[in-house]
């Protein structure tokens, strides 16, 4: 799959707009070459057909960029959180490994990716996310509070994106699940 086929014309415009905003928000925290290496990872993931749109047709790269803007602008997180968020799908789908990410971007980024993958796996396995045991397990799995904050930002972004969705039942299910997720466990 070519990257041109993966993005609509409107999504390409949005992608460039989000990219510029993210660069501005991240300021000096991104290291020289981070953006070029990140772009290479994302292109490889797209070209290997490793990531797909979700049930609402949302482009996962756009969704992650929007979430990264929330993470940077509304929460104030910087390099490790932004890169971890943007690269976790590439690691999850096997385009690259956490060890490769650690060598290229550092342990901090790799740690966030491992946390995001573990928490996403936990969410996919547990239908009872509102229980106290689940919240405690989530804290244990996350290990890093930044992972929980990224998950909250992701849920906020999804809820913002689907608010105008025509499929009411799917929208309610996502809102219910996201709402429960937003009740982040506090130690």
Where are these regions (language model features)?
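Active-site helical microenvironments for divalent-metal-assisted chemistry
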Residues: 1-187
């Amino acid at each position: 799959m070519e990257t041109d086929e993966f993005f609509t014309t409107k999504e390409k415009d949005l992608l460039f707009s989000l990219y510029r905003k993210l660069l501005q928000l991240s300021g000096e925290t991104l290291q020289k070459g981070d953006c070029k290496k990140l772009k290479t990872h994302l292109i490889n993931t797209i070209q290997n057909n490793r990531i797909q749109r979700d049930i609402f047709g949302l482009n996962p790269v756009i969704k992650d960029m929007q979430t990264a803007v929330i993470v940077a602008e509304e929460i104030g997180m910087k390099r490790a959180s932004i890169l971890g968020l943007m690269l976790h799908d590439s690691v999850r789908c096997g385009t690259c490994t956490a060890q490769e990410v650690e060598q290229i971007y550092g342990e901090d980024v790799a740690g966030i990716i491992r946390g995001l993958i573990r928490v996403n796996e936990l969410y996919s396995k547990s239908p009872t996310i509102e229980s106290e045991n689940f919240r405690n397990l989530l804290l244990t799995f996350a290990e890093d509070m930044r992972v929980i904050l990224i998950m909250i930002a992701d849920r906020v972004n999804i809820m913002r994106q689907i608010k105008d969705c025509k499929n009411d039942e799917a929208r309610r299910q996502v809102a219910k699940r996201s709402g429960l997720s937003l009740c982040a466990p506090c130690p």
